[in-house]
Amino acid sequence: MKILILSCNTGEGHNSAGKAVMEAALLRGQFMDLMLLGGKTVSHMVGGAYISIVRHIPAFFSLLYKVGGLISSSTRKSPVYYANSLLAGRLDRYIKEHSFDLILTPHLYAAEVLTCLKHRGLLSVPVIAIGTDYTCIPFWEETDCDCYIVPQKDLLGELIHKGLPKKRLFPLGIPVKQAFSTQKKRSLARKFCRLPSDAHVYLVMSGSMGFGKVNLLVAELIRKLEADEYVVVICGNNRRLRQILQTT
């Protein structure tokens, strides 16, 4: 079987899920191709704009999603859908040139382009969408994939309410790499991380981009720490956040 995984650079979570599926499929002897939507240049441009808006003007990002959510439905498409559909021609040529048997996408934008191709009668290859959010973000309801992998069953009601067909929803979780299945002794892990073996440790994570007011949360945690308690913060690729934490 020849499989295409289609992602986009708006945070590493989507790409990580795609790579995890790719790793599992390769172990089972499947041929895989991992592609960024629109190619590296377009993907990085879209991803860069997305990340800049989310990091620096989150209120504007929230407004865009709220307005889009009001417009979007299973029968009415949003401006986001039509913007993504501009990549349909390029993707159609790529799919036809490589004759894929199956397409998987961990990203909404790619799912919208594939939906556009399907509705134009240009796509007969089955499409599986992989959700990486623990909520139903706007615009999934305007996609038309053959199958949706959902992070957990508690999301089913929300997704169905938005208009996604129940028979296409499968709560199988978010794919992760094989490395997460490797069990290690806690004492060795603590030693590797240079943490006391008997201490209480609070882990703070906010995605690959280091979202949110993490520095304020950490400052409050540190203020209330006991003598045998530590805070470990995963900053992702947010160097500014790391610098702020190192100086506090």
Model regions: which residues?
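Conserved N-terminal ligand/cofactor-binding loop architecture of enzyme catalytic domains
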Residues: A20-E97
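A nucleotide-sugar donor-handling region in carbohydrate enzymes
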Residues: D146-V201, M205-M209, N237-L241
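Donor-nucleotide binding loops and adjacent catalytic segments primarily
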Residues: P196-T248
